[in-house]
Amino acid sequence: MGGTGVVSASYLTAPFYNPALTAIYRRNDDAGMLVPSLGISYDDQDKLLDKVDDAVSAAERDDWPATQAALQALSGTQAKVDFGGAVAFGIPNRFIAANIFGKAYIENVATPDIAPDNPDPIQQAVDTAIKTASVAVTEIGISLAKYQTLYGQHFSFGLSPKIQRIYTYTSVNSLQDFKFDNIREDATSDVAFNLDAGALWFHGPFRAGISARNMLSRSIDTKSGFVTVGGRDVAYGYQYQLQPLYTVGAGFIADYFQLSVDYDLNKEKKFTQFDDDVQMFRAGIEVDLVRQIQLRGGYHKNLARDSEGTLTAGIGLSPLNLFELSVAASYTSPQAMGASVNFLATY
């Protein structure tokens, strides 16, 4: 559903979108588990990897014009690879609904550091580096939520205290040696407490909500230093900013049909010196066929960058409501796509 969830997530996936939804469940739900949720996405819309290969190939052929053109094309490009997983155990309760959850995700970003202009473009290619940075975040927490009726209106409110362990990695490589596999060369780590919160209003199938994630901001410094690439020293060292993200959502959520929209109110600023800011708009739709098959589609776009929008499609299978297996794929371009799979069981 395009990654929406502020008003459309289930009580099992609520910790990852809006903890207030932990209190929204069916009367016959006694417990449930999400074991596991896995996803991966790849974004090389700038064709960084192809342009690195072009520059290396031209330099090896000793083709000066082609090398110079390849370096110019490579300048300003960026590539990203993200993947993650999650588990959750939900305990619906009319007093305080709870969901114990764990999550781990890794974000990798790479961009070139083009060497200064040189009369010899072959040497310029030898001196050019690819800088990479990665953050890995693992978190364990519990979502607690309560349903309330206020002035005749239906609300739920939720909090998710959690412990996070944050790892950062950096590397600097020549064009010829660059691989995303090399990204874990220099590592740092930090442990922190954080908090998510959310609220939901609903009236029949109509819903509106807001969520706040990582309400306690932190800045984590990566390792820094110099690496010799070709004939020059390349400096590295960045700061990863873990900042609050506020998202609003609205939707029509019925038994056999769902339509929802999410919008990030602010940008997520991540690594300094990398153009990796994120501010998402998401929209999604789901059609449920007799509670056995769910067909999903969606769209999302990063408003913080001049990038293409992404289409998503997925299917859920829930035979006899014993469990649910969901598979989804996303497509932006041949250079940017992703996939995910979820397995849920409720009792």
Summary of predicted features, one role per range:
Residues 2-347:
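Subset of outer-membrane beta-barrel
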